[in-house]
UniProtKB/Swiss-Prot annotation:
The keyword Signal applies. Belongs to the neurotoxin 19 (CSTX) family. 02 (D7) subfamily. One of its GO terms (cellular component) is extracellular region. This is Toxin-like structure LSTX-D6. Residues 21-41 form a propeptide. It is found in: Secreted. The presence of a 'disulfide through disulfide knot' structurally defines this protein as a knottin. Disulfide bonds join C45-C60, C52-C69, C59-C85, C71-C83.
Amino acid sequence: MMKVLVVAALLVTLISYSSSEGIDDLEADELLSLMANEQTRAKACTPRYYDCSHDRHSCCRSSMFKDVCTCFYPEGGDNKEVCTCQQPKHLKYMEKATDKIKNLFG
């Protein structure tokens, strides 16, 4: 009996919400014009093997996974840290495997 009351209350709530005037007063034309005028806020991503020390979360995506900013100290005595966008090996192998599977069945 309790389940029936809960379901009935849920249905009444959904019906009253859907029949109300709506929360948003924007018309479809206004919404489309706002979407057309909105500029992209995403900054440009850093390509693979380029320096990402300025922003370690800016690496581009490959076909499936996002590259990772990897930092290391190069050989040669310079103690300056170098950071580049790279694809981890396990993700590289996963992409190759999925590409081969897609080529077999697709």
